[in-house]
């Protein structure tokens, strides 16, 4: 696929070529389950051992790199890991004792837990910061800063950060800017094009897209970082299984159209909620009331399927969620089904008592692919349900 730069995102997702073609002429790539491969001569091989390389995983890694804008994706492929947190851990291996990491306060709870409970035990300084507070950010970064870590949109507050501005700030001290792109995927934001050094996704979410696969993927356009990650991936062993890689590759084929519908549904729900007498405030980058909509328009091709909101004090959240029919009370996101959760109680409890703590009445929605009117009616019924 030498002309990949000329192709659009959907075409790249569907037509990235396998490195090794089979004589059977499969139009859709099969799942390669073998854990070991025959040498033509001692030390001469296309593939050696399942942990160090697998055709199914490699195809997914090449496709992801292509979608992230890596021109030589045949060589600088992405790194597919066993889970989103395995991807986080892989990046964490870049940090050495006595170095420090700065993380935006509004971030996935598992990331908060990993850095505050695991990385600190390795002699690494970890600071949480509201990236909107540039003065605080500048006071925390220095020549010992290895990583500055953010999400845009953030989880669960759906905050939008001006990526290129923060890249300039971070690079002044020689640190790497890391983006969790799970909420967007490269179909919405290609973070590397905006100055990010490392982008990763929990493929469990939108990339897999059907709530039936677990994984994570890391991409960089920096050759030095890539070389280190390549070594870490092979030795850590936390690689994505062939079956999960197959499901993620299949998910990429429909990711563009799915995200378009996720975004359309979420935008309509956000507008409905903003007008509701039961809702205090809605956070969605596509709303005209969002102060960062202009920034979002510059770095997002669509506004995505995630939104959050505060209910007014007269709403009993337990009554609300118990009266929902289509929205399932569950963690995770990015599947075809709509999910609702209370971040403080379900995914961000590890932030309790820290600067990253979440308020009780914040509700997060992962908007699925159901008919919009059905989703609105479901919310309307639950919001107006009488207290017991």
Where are these regions (language model features)?
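N-terminal "arm"/small-domain region of PLP-dependent enzymes with the aminotransferase-like
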Residues: 1-54, 62-63, 363
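Conserved PLP-enzyme active-site core in the AAT-like
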Residues: 2-3, 13-15, 67, 73-278, ...
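Pocket-edge structural micro-motifs
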Residues: 16-18, 33-37, 51, 82, ...
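Short loop segments at secondary-structure junctions
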Residues: 36-37, 220-225, 252, 311-315, ...
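PLP-dependent enzyme catalytic core of the Aspartate aminotransferase-like
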Residues: 72-73, 125, 139, 146, ...
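Hydrophobic side chains in well-ordered alpha-helices
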Residues: 91, 228-229, 316-320, 375-379
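A common structural junction motif
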Residues: 236-237, 324-334, 382-388
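Conserved C-terminal alpha-helix-loop-beta "cap" of PLP-dependent enzymes
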Residues: 281-363, 367
């Amino acid at each position: 696929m030498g002309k990949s730069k000329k192709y659009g995102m959907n075409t790249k997702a569907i037509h990235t070529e396998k490195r090794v073609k089979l004589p059977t002429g499969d139009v859709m790539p099969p799942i390669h389950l073998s854990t070991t491969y025959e040498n033509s001569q001692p030390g001469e091989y296309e593939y050696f051992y399942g942990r160090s390389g697998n055709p199914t995983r490699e195809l997914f890694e090449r496709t992801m790199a292509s979608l992230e804008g890596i021109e030589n994706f045949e060589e600088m492929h992405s790194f597919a890991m066993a889970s989103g947190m395995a991807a986080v851990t892989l990046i964490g291996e870049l940090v050495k004792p006595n170095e420090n990491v700065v993380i935006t306060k509004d971030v996935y709870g598992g990331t908060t837990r990993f850095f505050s409970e695991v990385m600190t035990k390795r002699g690494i300084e970890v600071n949480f910061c509201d990236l909107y507070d540039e003065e605080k950010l500048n006071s925390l970064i220095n020549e010992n800063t290895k990583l500055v870590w953010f999400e845009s949109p953030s989880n669960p507050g759906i905050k939008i950060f001006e990526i290129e501005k923060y890249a300039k700030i971070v690079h002044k001290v020689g640190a790497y800017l890391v983006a969790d792109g799970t909420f967007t995927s490269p179909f919405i934001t290609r973070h590397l094009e905006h100055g990010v050094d490392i982008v990763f996704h929990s493929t469990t979410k939108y990339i897999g897209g059907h709530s039936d696969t677990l994984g994570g993927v890391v991409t960089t356009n920096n050759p030095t970082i890539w070389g280190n990650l390549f070594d870490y991936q092979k030795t850590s062993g936390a690689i994505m299984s062939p079956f999960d890689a197959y499901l993620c590759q299949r998910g990429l084929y429909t990711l563009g159209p799915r995200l378009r519908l996720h975004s359309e549904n979420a935008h309509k729900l956000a507008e409905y909620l903003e007008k509701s007498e039961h809702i205090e405030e809605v956070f969605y980058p596509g709303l005209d009331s969002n102060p960062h909509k202009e920034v979002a328009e510059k770095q997002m091709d669509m506004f995505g399927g995630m939104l959050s909101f505060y209910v007014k004090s007269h709403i009993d959240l337990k009554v609300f969620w118990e009266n929902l029919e289509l929205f399932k009370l569950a963690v995770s996101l990015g599947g075809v089904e709509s999910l609702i959760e209370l971040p403080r109680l379900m995914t961000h409890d590890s932030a309790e008592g820290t600067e990253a703590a979440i308020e009780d009445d914040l509700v997060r929605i992962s908007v699925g692919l159901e008919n919009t009117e059905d989703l609105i009616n479901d919310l309307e019924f639950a919001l107006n349900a009488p207290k017991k």
